[in-house]
């Protein structure tokens, strides 16, 4: 059962990690392809909105008698934000177009969410990236 749960979590994280990797490589000095990075950011935006809107299943699974049998650690929006934005931001803020697009994307995600906790998580990530982008522009 544990392996199966890890596979599900990995299945959700894998495409995020791949898109981040593609975007980071596209922003490398040797490639310098912000268009590809921006396309990856758009795909990440769509994925994060979909993941945020997924209904949360109970973290405790019970048997027929109501006895708790499995307690699962749930991946939440903050985990996916960290995987996507947290890993990509250091590369994106070095490119003005990609950095600005990432900030706008976080605004789009925030505007699409109704849950106040999720909005706060995205807003915090937005503010962090916007600060980094502003500090890069001052250099």
Please state what every model-predicted region is.
Residues 1-139:
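Short basic (Lys/Arg) and small-residue
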């Amino acid at each position: 059962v544990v392996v199966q749960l890890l596979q599900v979590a990995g299945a959700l994280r894998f495409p995020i990690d791949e898109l981040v990797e593609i975007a980071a490589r596209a922003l490398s000095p040797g490639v310098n392809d912000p268009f590809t990075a921006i396309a990856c950011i758009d795909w990440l935006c769509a994925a994060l909105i979909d993941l945020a809107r997924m209904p949360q299943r109970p973290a405790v699974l019970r048997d027929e008698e109501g006895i708790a049998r499995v307690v699962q650690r749930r991946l939440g929006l903050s985990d996916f934000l960290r995987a996507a934005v947290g890993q990509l931001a250091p590369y994106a803020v070095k490119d003005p177009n990609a950095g600005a697009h990432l900030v706008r994307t976080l605004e789009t995600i925030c505007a699409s969410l109704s849950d106040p906790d999720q909005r706060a998580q995205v807003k915090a990530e937005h503010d962090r990236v916007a600060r980094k982008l502003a500090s890069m522009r001052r250099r």
